[in-house]
C-alpha cells in the first residue's frame, strides 16, 4: 500500500518595523538617514524602529467553531400530501417462494469471491484513513521551522516587546484583563556587611538621617546661646553629666575643636577631655537630673550595704582576714599589730570601691589586674576606657564575680589556688559553690575568697 500527500506552502508572518512617524522601516544594519535641513525649533525624531510581531491565529479544533446550517424545505409536493409508491424489486433481490413466515434463522452465505483477508484489509484501511486525516490536519496547523532570517529580523532584547505589541500592548500599559497600570518589577539587591534577615535598607536610611539631624540640632543648641553667642567659653564653670567623669565639676581651659572641651577638675590639677554633649551649666535641668541620678545610685548602694550587715564584701574581707601577730620589742614589752595578707593575683577582675580615690571618677568601675608590683599593690587596666591605673592598693578594691558557670580562682582560705567554675552563688549569705577542674569536686567557699579569672591555667601560680 502506497501513501502520498502534499502540503501547501504557508506564508510566514512578516515582522514589521515601524518608526516613530509610523512608516515601516527595515533595520538591516546598513540603513542610511539623509539630513536635508536643520531646524532648531524641532526635535529629532526617533529613528529606531519599533518591531511588531503579528499574533498567530488560534487554530486549535476549528470544527468546534462550525455551526450546522438549516437546509431549506423542499416545495415540490408540499401541497399534495403523502403518497404511496409501489415497491419495485431490484434485480437479484427477488424473494424466494419457499420463504416461511415467523422466526427464521439466517444462514451465512459463503462467497468465494470475497475472502476474509479482504474484509480485514478494508477495516484496516478505514482506520488508517482516519489517522491520515488527523495527521493532515495537524500538519496544516503546524508552524514552519524558524530560519536565520527570522532571528535576524528582530533583535533578542526587543523580542518580548514586539510580541506583546502584536496583541495591542504599549509601553506603560498593564498586562491582564483588569490591569489599570503597569506593575514595576521588584529588584532584589544583595545584602552586604551586617545586613541580615529582616534588614530594611530604607528604614535604616531614615533612622540614620533622623539621628544625624537630631545630633546636629543638639550640637547647635549646645554651642549657641540665646543672643547668638557661645554658651561654653574658656574659663566657665560646668558640670560633667556623662562619660567616665560624670558628676565632677570643673572649668573649661581649652577648646581644641567644636566637639570637645578640655576641663580642669575642681580641687585637683587633673585635666580631662569631654564632648560637647557631656557638659551642662551649673544650675541647669541637665545638672539636676544628673545629680539626682547619682544620688539614687548612692541610696541603692547604702541599702545594699545595710542588707549585707552594713559592710561591703571588700571591708568584710579585710576585717575577717586580719590576723594578729605579737612580737617582742627590746624593752620586753609586747604589742599587737595587724598584718593583712595579700590576695592579689594577675589576670583577675576587681572593682574599685573607693569614692575618694581619683576624685571618685573610677568608683564602682571594673578592671583587670595586669601586674602585682607589691604585696598589696597592683596595676589595673579599666574595662571601659582601657586606661592603665598604676599603684592601686588592695584596700581600694574588691573581687568581681562572673556569671554562673564562669571561670574563677580561689584567692584565700584552705582552697587557695584552686581554679574552677562558679556553680552557685548566694548573695544574701555571701557563699558560693566552686567546681574544681582538676578533680571535679564541689567546694564551698565565701564569695570574698574568689574572683573572676581572665587568664590561662598555665599562668596560675600555685
From Swiss-Prot:
Pfam families: G-patch_2 (PF12656), GPKOW_C (PF25088). One of its GO terms (molecular function) is RNA binding. Residues 1-32, 301-340 are annotated as: Disordered. Keywords: Nucleus, Plant defense, Repeat. Residues 156-202 form the G-patch domain. PROSITE patterns: G_PATCH (PS50174). GO terms for biological process: defense response to bacterium; innate immune response-activating signaling pathway; mRNA splicing, via spliceosome. Residues 1-10 have a biased composition (Low complexity). Transmembrane segments: none annotated. Residues 231-258, 401-428 form the KOW domain. It is found in: Nucleus. Residues 301-336 have a biased composition (Basic and acidic residues). GO terms for cellular component: nucleus. Belongs to the MOS2 family. Required for innate and induced resistance to pathogens such as compatible and incompatible isolates of P.syringae and P.parasitica. This is Protein MOS2. It comes from Arabidopsis thaliana. The lineage of its organism: Eukaryota, Viridiplantae, Streptophyta, Embryophyta, Tracheophyta. The gene is MOS2.
Amino acid at each position: 500500500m502506497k501513501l502520498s500527500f502534499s502540503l501547501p506552502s504557508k506564508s510566514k508572518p512578516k515582522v514589521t518595523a515601524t518608526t516613530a512617524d509610523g512608516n515601516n522601516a527595515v533595520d538591516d544594519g546598513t540603513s542610511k538617514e539623509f539630513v536635508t535641513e536643520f531646524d532648531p525649533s524641532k526635535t529629532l525624531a526617533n529613528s529606531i524602529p519599533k518591531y511588531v510581531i503579528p499574533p498567530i491565529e488560534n487554530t486549535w479544533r476549528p470544527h468546534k467553531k462550525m455551526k450546522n446550517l438549516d437546509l431549506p424545505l423542499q416545495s415540490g409536493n408540499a401541497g399534495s400530501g403523502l403518497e404511496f409508491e409501489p415497491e419495485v424489486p431490484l434485480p437479484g433481490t427477488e424473494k424466494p417462494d419457499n420463504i416461511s413466515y415467523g422466526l427464521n434463522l439466517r444462514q451465512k452465505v459463503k462467497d468465494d469471491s470475497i475472502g476474509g483477508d479482504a474484509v480485514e484489509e478494508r477495516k484496516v484501511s478505514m482506520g488508517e484513513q482516519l489517522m491520515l486525516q488527523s495527521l493532515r490536519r495537524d500538519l496544516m496547523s503546524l508552524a514552519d521551522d524558524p530560519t536565520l532570517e527570522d532571528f535576524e529580523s528582530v533583535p533578542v532584547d526587543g523580542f518580548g516587546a514586539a510580541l506583546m505589541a502584536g496583541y495591542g500592548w504599549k509601553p506603560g500599559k498593564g498586562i491582564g484583563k483588569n490591569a489599570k497600570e503597569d506593575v514595576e518589577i521588584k529588584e532584589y539587591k544583595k545584602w552586604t556587611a551586617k545586613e541580615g534577615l529582616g534588614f530594611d535598607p530604607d528604614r535604616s536610611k531614615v533612622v540614620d538621617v533622623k539621628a544625624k539631624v537630631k545630633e546636629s540640632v543638639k550640637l547647635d543648641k549646645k554651642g549657641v546661646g540665646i543672643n547668638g553667642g557661645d554658651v561654653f567659653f574658656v574659663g566657665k564653670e560646668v558640670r560633667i553629666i556623662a562619660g567616665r567623669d560624670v558628676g565632677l565639676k570643673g572649668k573649661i581651659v581649652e577648646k581644641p575643636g567644636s566637639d570637645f572641651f578640655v576641663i580642669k577638675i575642681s580641687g585637683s590639677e587633673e585635666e580631662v577631655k569631654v564632648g560637647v554633649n557631656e557638659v551642662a551649666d551649673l544650675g541647669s535641668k541637665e545638672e539636676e537630673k544628673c545629680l539626682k541620678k547619682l544620688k539614687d545610685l548612692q541610696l541603692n548602694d547604702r541599702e545594699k550595704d545595710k542588707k549585707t550587715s552594713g559592710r561591703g564584701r571588700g571591708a568584710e574581707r579585710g576585717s575577717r582576714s586580719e590576723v594578729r601577730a605579737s612580737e617582742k620589742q627590746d624593752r620586753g614589752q609586747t604589742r599587737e599589730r595587724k598584718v593583712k595578707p595579700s590576695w592579689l593575683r594577675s589576670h583577675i577582675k576587681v572593682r574599685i570601691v573607693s569614692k575618694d580615690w581619683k576624685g571618685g571618677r573610677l568608683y564602682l568601675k571594673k578592671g583587670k589586674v595586669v601586674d602585682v608590683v607589691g604585696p598589696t599593690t597592683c596595676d589595673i587596666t579599666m574595662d571601659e576606657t582601657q586606661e592603665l591605673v598604676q599603684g592601686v592598693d588592695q584596700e581600694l578594691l574588691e573581687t568581681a564575680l562572673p556569671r554562673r558557670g564562669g571561670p574563677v580562682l580561689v584567692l584565700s582560705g584552705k582552697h587557695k589556688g584552686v581554679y574552677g567554675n562558679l556553680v552557685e552563688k548566694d548573695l544574701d549569705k555571701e557563699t558560693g559553690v566552686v567546681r574544681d577542674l582538676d578533680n571535679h569536686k564541689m567546694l564551698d567557699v565565701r564569695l570574698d575568697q574568689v574572683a573572676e579569672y581572665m587568664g590561662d591555667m598555665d599562668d596560675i601560680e600555685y
